[in-house]
Amino acid sequence: MKDIKTYSNKNILVLGLGKSGFAVSELLLKLGAKLTLNDKADLDKNEKAQELKAKGVRVIGGHHPVDLLEKEHFDYLVKNPGIPYENPMVKKAEELNIPIITEPEIALSCSDAPYVCVTGSNGKTTTVMLTQRILDHHLQKSGHHAYAVGNIGVPISEVVPKATKDDILVVEISSFQLLGVTDIDPKVAAIVDIYNNVHLDYHKTFENYVNAKLNVTRTQNSDDYFIANYDQKDILAKEKEVTPAKMQTFSETDSSADYFIGDEYLESQNEKIMKIVDIKLPGIHNLQNSLVAIAISKVMGADNDDIAAVLSTFTGAKHRLQYVTTLDGRKVYNDSKSTNIEAATVAIPSFKEPEVLIAGGLDRGFLFDDLVPLFKKHVKSIVLYGETKYLLADAARKAGIKDIVIVNTLQEAVPRAYELSEPGDVILFSPACASWDQFRTFEDRGDYFVKFVKELKTK
């Protein structure tokens, strides 16, 4: 780890103490910072907070003391990405011209290991997992490793102290994290895709959302690489304006892109890389994710053997078209990460078999008409729950689906989907909505879905 002096003897307030908040606090202590930790939750019984307190860190829990920023001098405020910029502490810091920084930027500035960054509305976690596995396969030949970090669930600050210059960090970075980033320089940056109804409750406008995503490449240099989606032409034009890096493109359909999906192979302009039939992940969108992982991995030194070793065995990330089990001849898939319409539009066409779809969740004010053609082509029956059940039912009726079942909860939906299905069908849970009407997170929702399926299997 680089022993940078930027934060040495600086008074720093860490706001929001989730997993990354605690990890960056430990890192800042190593760098010689003087820390104050604050969270609106009571921290008296929080084991990690008390450990830091024992190391001399001031811990303030239960409220956000806005007046503290006026009473004392702070050199930086480190903001948890989930805390909005409308938060009173953040607004006061802005008023007082206290620099607001983020965990990724601090951690990456200390990294001895080169790093690549992946963002996007959908597909970034799967892409990161594929990339990490390919690069790890490549690096293990020389006794080194690739680490998947960031929004994927492992704070960057946790891994940076142990990663060497011969390792590689594969960073999943969200728009929430990127909004606060002013200076990162990934060797490779990639934007898998950008859709216009994602996280607008946080970013307020689509333009703000796009600009946050573009921060992943804005401060790269001319020796770096940027991987862009050739099929999203409007976004591509903005990316060309912003990036200083060498651009490579990928496409689902256009063979003029640097990497593309051919008739039988994933291909580049120079070669046929891998037979599509040998790739384990289902769905055209996962072929696209594979192209991004290939493009990144090639820049970082991996070869086709590394790529084939991973793509021929990797069966998917949890909650992302995750195969759960087979129930009496019916394959069951958990796609709880489908928190928006676009995610459902890539999940639903992923199977050749007839589908019984389970969908529904938080009502964000969107209509579901974009799903009508997919419902018509792929879905034989549908079970709906949550705040959006009636809106989704309207779309299902427009698609001509006859078996439309409306229930109140996911627990009720699972056995009804089984009843509507036949051997040879796929039961697909792809909600097309956020989880917060009935669940804490999409992970929580997906875990419950798997639990309900397993309960059904034991009956």
From Swiss-Prot:
Example of a GO biological process term: cell wall organization
EC number: 6.3.2.9
Enzyme type, top EC level: ligase
InterPro entries: Mur-like_cat_sf, Mur_ligase_C, Mur_ligase_C_dom_sf, Mur_ligase_cen, MurD
Domain of life: Bacteria
Recorded family membership: Belongs to the MurCDEF family.
Protein's name in the database: UDP-N-acetylmuramoylalanine--D-glutamate ligase
Organism expressing this protein natively: Lactobacillus helveticus (strain DPC 4571)
